[in-house]
From Swiss-Prot:
This is Secreted RxLR effector protein 80. It comes from the Eukaryota. A motif (RxLR) lies at residues 72-75. Belongs to the RxLR effector family. Residues 1-21 form the signal peptide. Transmembrane segments: none annotated.
Amino acid sequence: MKKRALPIVIFVISLQQSSQSFAVLDLLDQLFHKILNLSSRSISCSNCLKHRLQIPYFCSLHKGLNTVHKFRSLRTFQQCHELSKSNQKCHLSVMTRQVLRSRIMRALPLIKESLLLAQFLQ
């Protein structure tokens, strides 16, 4: 299982260093969510065209593609949805791409160490 995770992480890092086009950023979003093992059930906001993340309690409202709002419950998600209807700013907590990247970077040494150990034990 861990052997499959490493190429994804390496791919994310190589994408970080390439041009930051919208397509690349969209792909990064998808990869980050897969790496963070988020649920696959979906709650989507029909009022926002930019909402592309079909993952519970995550919403890209108000901040476009650069940040995602992370919610602890369905209630806070619905509050954000209501704010979007009236075009108000959402003041809920935001998880930026930089936070997601730093989590992956911190996990890299552990992944590499696990792979080396697995190869040694084979």
